[in-house]
Amino acid sequence: MVPALAVADALRAEGAEVTFIGGERAEAELVPAAGYPLRTISAEGLSRTSPLRAVRALGRAALALAHSRSLLAELSPDAVMGGGGYVAGPVGLAALTRRIPLVLTEADGHLGLANRALAPAARRVCLSFPIEGRHGKRYRVTGRPIPALGGDRASARERFGIAAHELCVLVFGGSLGARSINQAALDAFASGAFHVVHICGRRDYPELAQRPLPRGYDLREYLDLEDFADALAACDLVLARAGGSVFEIAAHGLPAILVPYPHASADHQSANARWMSRAGAAIVIPDGELTAARLAREVAELLANRSRLAAMASASRRLARPDAAREIAAEILEAAGR
């Protein structure tokens, strides 16, 4: 949802009106908070393990397609953008059946099920990474859209109570958090030798908040988009999963220690992590090899070697695609005849 909001902001800056069609999960909170109207449909992902759930999902998809066609008839958009996922499938198909130009975005290093089905008929498919076999004028590598960058480093550090001389490590693992990272970070960073901003997620926060924390250990359940951007601006090193946030890490020119989620679809987080590692911007630790001792050693060595930290930061910055949202917005406006 964050990439879609970034594109919406770029479209709005060009004078376009934007309406979201989504489900009733995160978008039900994020979209209205960002100032955009949201229309909802009922759909669910296609289960690959439960035949009963798969049949139910197909039934809901048929209803979602009919509902999507009705909404598009009412809204009469000049173009539709699909971001992949269980809602984008029926909405994208509805757009094609109504002959509305469709632009797709793919956040991962492979096309998801909905995008694979819709890509042959889409006006443009905007890719975060080059994907083997996806070439030609229909495909364009734009990078993954990210929110606007945070404020300047000095004000961001002041906001988080980080002294000018302190080094800061930012830890996060998605909205629910990442249990392996949460546990390893708390044990590895108990010395208080540097400042830590740790966004642990909803699932683990009640338990972790009961633990004694060293000075300078800032444990948070959640940060909104603006605060998260400031946290990135304030820190010197990131410890995180390797989802779409790798593009935000790169946009801020940050070195990273990445722990890919081992059960991600098509293992795309490992591919994301390799992308940063090959460029010299990240150290990759497989989830099964993450221990507090190894994490403490890796972080201590990095923070003690300022020249290596700076080289990784430069490599990260070279990977950045800060104009991705504007490039995708331009594709949508062109498809819409603007």
List each model region and its residues.
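C-terminal "capping" alpha-helix adjacent to the active site of nucleotide-linked donor transferases
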Residues: 285-286, 290-307
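Conserved nucleotide-sugar phosphate-binding/catalytic loop shared by glycosyltransferases and other
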Residues: 12-63, 69, 142-144, 202-204, ...
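C-terminal alpha-helical cap of glycosyltransferases
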Residues: 301, 321-338
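A short, well-ordered alpha-helix in the C-terminal region of glycosyltransferases
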Residues: 308-322
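A short helix/loop element that forms part of the nucleotide-sugar donor recognition site in Leloir-type
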Residues: 53-55, 150-162
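Active-site-proximal region of nucleotide-activated glycan assembly enzymes
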Residues: 17, 25, 37, 96-154
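Acidic donor-binding loop of glycosyltransferase active sites
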Residues: 77-79, 233-247, 254
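Donor-nucleotide binding loops and adjacent catalytic segments primarily
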Residues: 28-30, 155, 162-240, 270-274, ...
